[in-house]
């Protein structure tokens, strides 16, 4: 048996200390460059055809539409001279096809048109956050590649989502300019509203919730897979970093990955995001039980555990006397509780360092942040980043970012904007 839990994890590479920052950054930067050149790598590097050069108009309303979960949401957004948003006439309705019944494209557009009806007289532009796998086109439309999140609406696959909505609205007597974008790109653009009063050199957007992704603004000269771009301009890139394969998997990562429906895919996302950390933690705890770190009753209970939600894992690591969830029901003594904490917290600590590497790679690729007066704005959204209890994940990420960027002479400002995707969609609709 390994002498200590720390030695057990370190010899297997599951710790923040085991993350090779320089190697991880080099792999990220290599794949980002290759992806922008159109070469096949694990990062999709999807051009969003949205820049950041235009100022955000003050006092001009824009309609925002958000489709990405069980609900569709709509609102009217206006910005003041300080970049503060005013959100009005907010409404929501159920997402067609997400309630266990099949829906059609016509159902989808009818529901959208009905949701937007009270807002259509107030603005000419619509910023549409569409958080499903889609190919963004140069006219800021989106071709749906596939549905996720259990949505059942097969006849919309391969269709142009924005054009379909524009047609449905025009049939009702309303001609609108629609800008479609992903939630990650919208999160990045939300920083533009903060940039009205704070002068940033560039922008990054990170989602770290049930899943993860990052977007950043790349110089057009580096985006060689898109022809005839203005050479001196820049464009937002949706990197799709959840699919990054440049971080070596530990034996725990491989064992957990083998149990998922998409084995071998989204391996980076499975190391850092909320949908997967509980499942990964179960394999770590069970390995610790087999290694002899738990009492006999606790070992038996852990080895019989068939699933572990991240909330239960996180809650118990934060408070090992909690009685809720799968771990709270197990016959732990105080030594067992200490073992859960010692085995569990490194899972979250590694996630924080990997997330910081992701951020820093994007900051470096923007070419900005060389002057502390004008740092790169990194807008971060997602429950895993802000609500993890086992460790202060937000503070750990911030410290790692300082440690990584500081010696490189780079500066970043990590910010939170409430309802970032909604605010970013408003910016997109106003500045396209």
Question: Residue ranges of each PLM-predicted region?
Answer:
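ATP-binding/phosphotransfer module of carbohydrate and carboxylate kinases, centering on a glycine-rich
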Residues: 1-90, 94, 100-125, 170, ...
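Short, well-ordered loop/turn elements at secondary-structure boundaries
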Residues: 57-59, 121-122, 174-175, 183, ...
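Short glycine-aspartate micro-motif
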Residues: 60-66, 125-129, 177-179, 203-207, ...
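Conserved beta-strand elements of beta-rich interaction domains across eukaryotes
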Residues: 69-70, 79-81, 133, 211-213, ...
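Short beta-strand scaffold segments in enzyme catalytic cores
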Residues: 72-77, 188-190, 205-206, 212-218
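Glycine-rich phosphate-binding loop and adjoining helix at the ATP-binding site
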Residues: 92-110, 134-204, 220-248, 392-399
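Acidic, glycine-rich active-site loops and adjacent beta-strand->loop/helix elements
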Residues: 97, 184-186, 209-212, 220, ...
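Alpha-helical segment proximal to the catalytic Tyr-Lys
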Residues: 214-215, 225-267, 271-273
């Amino acid at each position: 048996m390994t002498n200590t839990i720390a030695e057990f994890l370190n010899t297997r590479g599951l710790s923040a200390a085991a993350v090779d920052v320089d190697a991880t950054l080099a792999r990220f930067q290599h794949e980002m460059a290759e992806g922008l050149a159109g070469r096949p790598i694990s990062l999709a590097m999807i051009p969003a055809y949205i820049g950041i050069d235009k100022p955000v108009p003050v006092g001009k309303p824009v309609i925002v539409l958000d489709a990405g979960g069980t609900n569709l949401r709509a609102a009217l957004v206006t910005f003041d001279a300080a970049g503060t948003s005013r959100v009005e006439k907010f409404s929501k309705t159920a997402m067609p096809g997400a309630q266990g019944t099949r829906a059609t494209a016509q159902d989808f557009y009818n529901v959208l048109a009905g949701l937007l009806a009270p807002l259509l007289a107030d603005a000419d532009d619509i910023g549409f956050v569409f958080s499903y796998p889609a190919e963004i086109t140069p006219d800021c439309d989106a071709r749906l590649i596939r549905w996720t999140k259990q949505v059942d609406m097969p006849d919309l696959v391969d269709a142009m989502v924005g054009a379909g909505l524009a047609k449905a609205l025009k049939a009702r007597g309303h001609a609108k300019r629609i800008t479609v974008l992903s939630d990650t790109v919208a999160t990045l653009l939300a920083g533009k509203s903060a940039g009205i009063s704070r002068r940033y050199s560039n922008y990054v957007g990170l989602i770290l919730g049930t899943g993860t992704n990052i977007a950043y603004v790349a110089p057009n000269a580096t985006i060689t897979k898109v022809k005839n771009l203005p050479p001196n301009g820049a464009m937002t890139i949706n990197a799709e970093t959840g699919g990054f394969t440049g971080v070596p998997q530990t034996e725990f990562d491989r064992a957990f990955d083998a149990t998922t429906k998409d084995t071998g895919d989204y391996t980076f996302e499975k190391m850092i995001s909320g949908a997967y950390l509980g499942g990964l933690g179960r394999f770590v705890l069970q390995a610790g039980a087999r290694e002899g770190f738990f009492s006999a009753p606790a070992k038996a209970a852990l080895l019989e555990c068939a699933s572990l939600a991240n909330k239960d894992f996180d809650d118990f690591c934060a408070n090992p006397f909690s009685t809720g969830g799968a771990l709270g029901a197990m016959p732990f003594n105080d030594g067992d509780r200490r073992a859960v904490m010692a085995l569990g917290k490194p899972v979250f600590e590694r996630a924080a360092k990997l997330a910081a590497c992701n951020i820093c790679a994007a900051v470096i690729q923007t070419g900005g942040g060389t002057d502390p007066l004008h740092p790169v704005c990194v807008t971060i959204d997602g429950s895993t980043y802000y609500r993890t209890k086992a460790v202060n994940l937000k503070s750990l990420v911030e410290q790692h970012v300082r440690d990584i960027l500081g010696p490189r002479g780079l500066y970043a400002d990590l910010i939170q904007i409430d309802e970032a995707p909604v605010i970013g969609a408003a910016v997109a609709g106003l500045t396209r």
